[in-house]
Regions:
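Extended low-complexity, serine/threonine- and proline-enriched intrinsically disordered segments
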Residues: 30-58, 154-179
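Low-complexity, Pro/Ser/Thr- and charge-rich linker/hinge segments at domain boundaries
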Residues: 116-139
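Ligand-binding face of N-terminal immunoglobulin V-set domains in extracellular IgSF glycoproteins
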Residues: 74-102
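Extracellular Ig-like/FN3 beta-sandwich strand-entry sites
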Residues: 17, 31-33, 92-96, 197-206
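Aromatic sugar-binding surface patches on proteins
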Residues: 63-66, 71-85, 184-213
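Short acidic/polar inter-strand loop motif in beta-rich domains
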Residues: 43-45, 89, 103-109, 170, ...
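Contiguous beta-strand segments within globular domains
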Residues: 1-40, 135-148
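Edge beta-strands of extracellular beta-sandwich domains
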Residues: 110-114
Length: 214
C-alpha cells in the first residue's frame, strides 16, 4: 500500500514538505531487517545524474524500524511502515522519485514511484475537438498556457524546461514537449496538442423520439 495524506493510488503525487507512507506485509515471521533507498529521476523516469546530496538531506539506505506483528489472524505476518520525510531523510527539491526496499543481504524486493511538486506557476488548459477527420472520434486537442515571469529565460536550446502530458497517471502514453509554439515575457503557449482521449461524449442527439400512433 502506498499513499499520501490525501491520495491512495498506484502513482502518487504530493506537495513538497507533505508526507507519504509506504506499508507492506512480510509473511516470513523470522526476524528480518529491511532497508529503504531513495532515487531521483528526470522527466521521463530515467535515473538523473544528481548526487544523493543534491536531492535529499540526511541519510539514505535507512533501516525500517516501524513495524507491528499481526494479532489473532489465520496467518502470522509483520506489517512494516515508512513515512517520509522523517527525522533521517528530507527532500531538497521537487521531481520524480522512487522508494525501493531491500533485505539485509542487499536483495532488491520492490520499488514504488512518486512525484513531489511545487506550485510555482499557473497552467491553463483548453480542450477541443480534433480537427483531423481521421482522428475525430479518437483524439482531442489541447491548448496549454503556462504563466511565468521572465519566460524568455526558460526557452532556448539549453533550456531544461519540459512539459510532460500524461493521461490517467499512465506514463506509457506520455507526450513530452521541449519548446512552446509561442513565448512571451509572461507566458508560454503550446497549441494544438493532439492526444488520444476519446470523443464519445461530444455528440448529443436531441432529436425527438415522440411519434404518433396510427
Amino acid at each position: 500500500n502506498f499513499a499520501s495524506e490525501k491520495l491512495n493510488s498506484s502513482y502518487t503525487v504530493i506537495k513538497k514538505n507533505k508526507f507519504i507512507t509506504l506499508s507492506f506485509d512480510d509473511l516470513n515471521i523470522k526476524d528480518s531487517d529491511y532497508y529503504y533507498q531513495i532515487n531521483h529521476f528526470n522527466h521521463v523516469w530515467e535515473k538523473s545524474n544528481l548526487f544523493k546530496s543534491d536531492y535529499i538531506e540526511g541519510y539514505d539506505d535507512n533501516l525500517i524500524t516501524n513495524y507491528s506483528n499481526s494479532f489473532n489472524t489465520l496467518v502470522d505476518y509483520k506489517n512494516f511502515r515508512i513515512t517520509i520525510p522523517n527525522k533521517n531523510l528530507k527532500f531538497k527539491i521537487s521531481g520524480n522519485y522512487s522508494i525501493s526496499v531491500h533485505d539485509d543481504y542487499g536483495n532488491f524486493l520492490f520499488e514504488r514511484k512518486f512525484s513531489i511538486l511545487e506550485e510555482k506557476t499557473k497552467i491553463n488548459i483548453e480542450f477541443f475537438k480534433s480537427k483531423n477527420l481521421k482522428n475525430y472520434n479518437s483524439h482531442q486537442n489541447l491548448d496549454i498556457t503556462v504563466n511565468c515571469s521572465n519566460c524568455n529565460n526558460l526557452t532556448g536550446s539549453s533550456s531544461q524546461l519540459k512539459l510532460v502530458i500524461i493521461k490517467n497517471n499512465q506514463w506509457s502514453n506520455k507526450i513530452v514537449l521541449s519548446e512552446p509554439d509561442f513565448f512571451f515575457d509572461n507566458k508560454l503557449i503550446y497549441k494544438n496538442i493532439s492526444y488520444r482521449g476519446g470523443n464519445e461524449f461530444y455528440y448529443f442527439d436531441n432529436s425527438s423520439i415522440n411519434s404518433t400512433n396510427l
